[in-house]
Amino acid sequence: MNAPFTYSSPTLSVEALKHSIAYKLMFTIGKDPVVANKHEWLNATLFAVRDRLVERWLRSNRAQLSQETRQVYYLSMEFLIGRTLSNAMLSLGIYEDVQGALEAMGLNLEELIDEENDPGLGNGGLGRLAACFLDSLATLGLPGRGYGIRYDYGMFKQNIVNGSQKESPDYWLEYGNPWEFKRHNTRYKVRFGGRIQQEGKKTRWIETEEILGVAYDQIIPGYDTDATNTLRLWSAQASSEINLGKFNQGDYFAAVEDKNHSENVSRVLYPDDSTYSGRELRLRQEYFLVSSTIQDILSRHYQLHKTYDNLADKIAIHLNDTHPVLSIPEMMRLLIDEHQFSWDDAFEVCCQVFSYTNHTLMSEALETWPVDMLGKILPRHLQIIFEINDYFLKTLQEQYPNDTDLLGRASIIDESNGRRVRMAWLAVVVSHKVNGVSELHSNLMVQSLFADFAKIFPGRFTNVTNGVTPRRWLAVANPSLSAVLDEHLGRNWRTDLSLLNELQQHCDFPMVNHAVHQAKLENKKRLAEYIAQQLNVVVNPKALFDVQIKRIHEYKRQLMNVLHVITRYNRIKADPDAKWVPRVNIFGGKAASAYYMAKHIIHLINDVAKVINNDPQIGDKLKVVFIPNYSVSLAQLIIPAADLSEQISLAGTEASGTSNMKFALNGALTIGTLDGANVEMLDHVGADNIFIFGNTAEEVEELRRQGYKPREYYEKDEELHQVLTQIGSGVFSPEDPGRYRDLVDSLINFGDHYQVLADYRSYVDCQDKVDELYELQEEWTAKAMLNIANMGYFSSDRTIKEYADHIWHIDPVRL
């Protein structure tokens, strides 16, 4: 790299890496190799690998600046990037070299990788999608950066105590984070509260409290390319360290109280929003992210172009869900109040730069903020939102003069529920493009949630089906299968997943079929070892591994899965000597800390597991396992070992899902409803290679319209009746027989909102077909191979190309 002085780049040989790791341990960490522990060796290795990425990173940044390319800025409250070391070594192609260097020093790379804390800066699919997107942006050489919050405490650590979920803090930074660069000089004032003062036409926001947003940068490496991008995370810092006056008077606690209050903003991911103060902190968090980010975007733009006139030509800002939608009024505020734009010009810029992804159609999950709360914390922004709404409703009135109901429905301010600001509405009114994340979801979006807006802005809505990065989800997570693919297809599938299609031609070759089967068995043995060590449950790797790992939520219907497990248990008890296909049912996922029913479901899974796993009549025929503290790194262990992937949400509720893609890519067959991306997976893999059951989205709606009566299913279906009676009468909770009465009531007597009972029989019958196929191992593996072969479409590289071409209009950087 050109520099005004000479220096020697770090080289990539085993010997050089060995020296580098030892050097980092001694001179950066300051530790004697004789007494250093695994964490210190891990950090030294991370520093050594990071050094080898820095030049690429600086070169990429320099190229983006010199070519004055249009950039995309991707805003998300969540980024679940997973462990960084294995991914970085894979991107650089130095996995074996680092392994060799560590071995020469008597260390085991796999053990060090397991020491790395998984940064829990997200809750589920939203954050993992954002991470896959950053990986693809870098691999494709597209100019972009992610912006999020550097939470001190990530998603809580989940412990299972007496069958129940208990949360403890997840301090992922306890051993430091060598992967990040703190940018002491990149800091912005973020303001809250205060009041607005009109001075003629000019508006001033005064008497505010201030905190600072300080930047921390992480390198996002592209695979096998010099292109790298940046994830910039903001940490909150008090604008003044302590109140010295109070300190000198001896009031030490009061002296630091303000500092602590300020820094709470980036302390924890998603504070409990069941209280007013929790909701207020959540709003402050969202504004903290957008204010720091929009100030940074404008500052970077001005440094490069010395004008704001070309803003709309040079930047695209993407809002991942509604959490960062306050970016819109913040951009308006900065352009009008600080950069002397007229209101109309500022609005025009916003309409050109913002785009928004909708991730849910469920009304309870759509963000709204009380007008009073917004007015108290962000008075200037509320004023701007009112102005945008007035402008929008005026133009609407001109277009539809006789439709007063439409004005009420389309207004950004919901007047019917205690005056609330609808964030999704604000995003749709201002963004130039709004996308859903699967064909089904995008269609439902314009037919239901945004039907009025689809009529008002017909060209605004589009679909971009989600994808996953093959680097992390196949190359890193599944070395056994990757080796088989490399041998028969070459290595280029890592950057062009459509090349997996060639695997179709190998489905009938016994040798390849056997190799794929063996790779699966190796992964199952690895998971079985983990389950034995961590949970003290012995499972048979030759049994069918039936897996459902995702957030615990009623719409994802883990409960229906449990009903099938109990049905299976009852059948085995009735005829223990029959030839049963042995199964291991594996669950994993966290329930939101204030979500009573989801926590109840976890308790039920563990109670059922306790009874089944300790029943001598059952033995290896059926095991039930709940793996606690689900994370990206656990997903990388579990997904490659799955035979059957459970994607059983009620049709019309899951926007897309991405674990469905990860499982199929790793050779699991899917059992699922026609929901989210399952619909497109069916199109790609063919109806013979996927297990589809249950009502369609139309049938679900029809059932609701007719008046769904769950009790009828309970009374008509003997097996279902038996299962629900067992749960309700305490068969699985003998020490507390009434524990699940309310849960059973919610299904039979209180509407069964997610229609578990309606789909139960179809689901159980479909599971019987799964058993039949699993007995024909070669045929099962051939179908698994067809799934792998047809996953090319579901690469996040394809997804990002679509965003780049149709929404962001950005081109790759020339390196």
Curated annotation (Swiss-Prot):
Protein name: Glycogen phosphorylase
GO biological process, one term: glycogen catabolic process
GO-annotated molecular function: glycogen phosphorylase activity; protein homodimerization activity; pyridoxal phosphate binding
Organism: Escherichia coli (strain K12)
Reaction(s) catalysed (UniProt annotation): [(1->4)-alpha-D-glucosyl](n) + phosphate = [(1->4)-alpha-D-glucosyl](n-1) + alpha-D-glucose 1-phosphate
Role of this protein: Phosphorylase is an important allosteric enzyme in carbohydrate metabolism. Enzymes from different sources differ in their regulatory mechanisms and in their natural substrates. However, all known phosphorylases share catalytic and structural properties.
Family label: Belongs to the glycogen phosphorylase family.
Enzyme class, first EC level, given as a word: transferase
